[in-house]
A protein has these predicted regions:
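Divalent-metal-activated hydrolytic enzyme cores
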Residues: 1-24, 59-68, 76-81, 92-155
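Short, charged/polar surface micro-motifs in flexible loops or helix N-caps
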Residues: 33-35
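Short beta-strand segments
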Residues: 29-31, 55, 87-89
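A common structural microfeature
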Residues: 23-26, 48-51
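Short Gly/aromatic-enriched secondary-structure transition segments
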Residues: 41-46
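A short beta-strand-loop structural module common to alpha/beta enzyme folds
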Residues: 51-58
Length: 155
């Protein structure tokens, strides 16, 4: 917080000022991997204000009515995005992710079995929800390729 206070006081934000509309009219769905924070924009030649960046574990669309689709809808229908890119990377932590192992990690960090059981009772299928993917290229095709086409692509 001290850094942020100094940043604001010194007006460090001024060089980042832009509006909410992406200059390149692109939305990018990518992984939240820390290695991509600076690497992905550098590799694509994008800067602050160019694109709408949506990040999650694995860069996947895990539910047709989830937050990724909602974010893409806002980007497209409210903010002028005309192109969506789904970008994966090598050595992704979500690849080969085990739902059973993650549940064990949750328990080790204090989540009680009764909490997990209650969530399952509410309809959450932990096994499929927490499962990663086996193949990066197939994941991009499934979660970002022909699986989700706009009506303009199918006419």
């Amino acid at each position: 917080m001290q850094y942020n206070k100094r940043f604001v006081a010194e007006k460090g934000y001024e060089k980042y000022i832009t509006n909410k509309y992406p200059d390149k009219k692109i939305a990018i769905l990518s992984c939240m991997d820390t290695r991509l924070t600076a690497l992905l924009p550098a590799a694509l030649g994008i800067k602050n204000g160019d694109v709408k960046m949506i990040k999650n574990a694995g860069g996947i669309i895990s539910h047709p009515f989830g937050s990724v689709i909602r974010s893409l809808m806002v980007a497209i229908y409210e903010l002028g995005v005309t192109e969506v890119m789904v970008i994966a990377h090598s050595d992704c932590g979500a690849c080969h992710m085990s739902s059973a192992q993650m549940i064990e990690h949750m328990k080790a960090r204090g989540i009680k079995q009764e909490t997990i059981d209650m969530i399952r009772f509410c309809g959450v299928d932990f096994e499929s929800w927490l499962y990663g993917f086996e193949d990066t290229e197939k994941s991009v095709k499934r979660y970002g390729g022909s699986y989700y086409q706009s009506s303009a692509d199918t006419e």
